[in-house]
Amino acid sequence: MNRSSAGETAKEPRPPRRRETAAARAERAATICRRLARAYPAADCSLDFGNPFELLVATILSAQCTDRRVNLVTVDLFRRWPTPAALAAARPRELEAVIRSTGFFRAKAKSLLGCARGLLERHDGEVPRSLEALVQLAGVGRKTANVVMGVAFGEATGVVVDTHVGRISRRLGLTRQTDAVRAERDLVKVVPRTHWIAFSHRLIEHGRSVCLARRPRCAGCVLADLCPRVGVP
């Protein structure tokens, strides 16, 4: 256990040994959030963007791609097509060439073009400040919509579940679901709403530095005493 949290040990819930009640899981989740907040106080979205439109585009590109790679690509992309109107008029092959290194470039180009046209046709070229409206745009699912709502607009509409968040949440026993949408349903029941936005950023940082996919570094983990799978890959 991390010694910095020793003062809370006597009061903090232990990881489940038998069937954990919903109330106990919520209490443990709240403790996890507090620990993560202390460990990663500056955790934030690692995508580079200057406005909601750029964040929307970057998040669509981030599927099955690292944020670092996306940030390299969007420098040129936003220079060429800085607005929804400009992107909607882009030539598909030219757009594909620019985003090729992000993977699945044909599908992503189609999504970006459809999304830009949707913004023009239904929202006067503005990114809607509504989860329901966002998910109606091409290439935008709950994950992307939650990122935009949380990061661009500061509104907690859900928990962003990426590979790191899903993996660590399952290890912590906060969900058993491998499907991102179903996992999110479990997480919003136990993670305090005030932590929904930051929770994902902090778990992503934790997943990159400590709770690795193949060899988690449990010995140095601030959540080890709260994790039912400590020491198990």
Question: PLM features: what roles do these ranges have?
Answer:
Residues R17-P233:
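Catalytic cores of DNA base-excision repair glycosylases
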Residues M1-A22:
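Short, contiguous pre-domain boundary segments
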